[in-house]
Amino acid sequence: MKNCLVVDDSKVIRKVARHILESLNIRVSEACDGRDALNQCQNAEHDVVLLDWNMPVMSGMEFLQQLSSINVARPKVIFCTTENGLGHIRAALDAGADEYVMKPFDRDILESKLQQVGVI
Ligand SMILES: [Mg+2]
């Protein structure tokens, strides 16, 4: 069973993502900011990280930059953005994100992104 770390400061987004991912037979853990996510990545391996950009404490971008400095098997990273964050996509891909998805996302789009990064 693959596992996904859902990183978002919105409890509602985490809940929606969890629901979709579990329906795709993926085990889910949640982090509420980049720092929390980094700690969890140091403690357990994840196949994929679904990553929000704007979060308190540590942003998605800072998480991406620090992920490469910790000594773990690197998860695939799908960066989540809103239409307002379109300009962030290039920066996220440059910083090592594998794919991106626009919010609000649905099951079909998330499934196709997970296929594109080879998780399912
Ligand atoms: Mg956010």
Please annotate each region the language model reported.
Residues 15-23:
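Charged docking surfaces used in two-component/phosphorelay signaling
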Residues 25-32, 40:
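Short hydrophobic/Thr-rich beta-strand motif most characteristic of the beta2 strand and flanking loop
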Residues 33-36, 59-65:
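Acidic catalytic/metal-coordinating carboxylates
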Residues 45-50:
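Active-site beta3 strand of CheY-like receiver
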Residues 55:
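Receiver (REC) domain active-site loop signature in two-component systems and cognate sites
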Residues 62, 84-99:
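Alpha4 helix (beta4-alpha4-beta5 surface) of REC/receiver domains from two-component response regulators
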Residues 87, 105-114:
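C-terminal output helix
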